[in-house]
Amino acid sequence: MPDTRLSRAGDKGALTELWQAVFGDNAELISAFFSLLCRPEYCRVACADGKIASMGFCLPGPEAMGLKCAYIYAMATAEDARSRGLAAAVGAALIEDAFESGADIVATLPADEGLCAWYETRFGMSPLFKKGGPGVVFPDNWLEFARICGGHDPDTPQRLYAVARGGIDTAGLEDLGWELTFD
């Protein structure tokens, strides 16, 4: 599996460039994300040809029925670096980091239905939380970023995919809504 590393303060420009290239988001949204939600230890990167070619963020903060959750967001790989296992390495490292930091559950909302199987086969994730609605509790900085992002994208899946740390019972979580997906 390719090597990954935690992001560094000097990576912000390269991360912003990759984010814009893959997602097309504007500079205001990306800047708000870095200001409100991101710390270097929440981001993993993989490099190819001497530059950041893949990234992902795993954001702590939400709670579901007393369980600490983390959320994988903005997984992106440069088009010319795809199919090399970079994103899989980044995602695996993010999940490992989250569990080592005390998360009970790591969740994500795949960008489209086609990615659900990718998250399932690479990381053992399965459908869990409902997209939208009450249930999961979020910190204030998440609420602030959500106001900038806007509402849900109707084209994203209706369930978040998640994996629990060993020994964690997820019974009852399938009825909880996860309102802040930033999609």
Model-predicted segments: where are they?
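Conserved GNAT acetyl-CoA-binding A-motif
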Residues: 91, 98-111
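Conserved active-site tyrosine of GNAT-family acetyltransferases
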Residues: 119-120, 125, 146
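Intrinsically disordered, low-complexity, positively biased terminal segments
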Residues: 133-183
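A conserved beta-strand-loop-helix scaffold within acyl/acetyltransferase catalytic domains
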Residues: 4-7, 12-76
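Conserved acetyl-CoA-binding loop-helix of GNAT-fold acetyltransferases
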Residues: 77, 83-98
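Short glycine/proline-centered loop/turn elements that form peptide/ligand docking sites
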Residues: 91, 114-115, 134-138
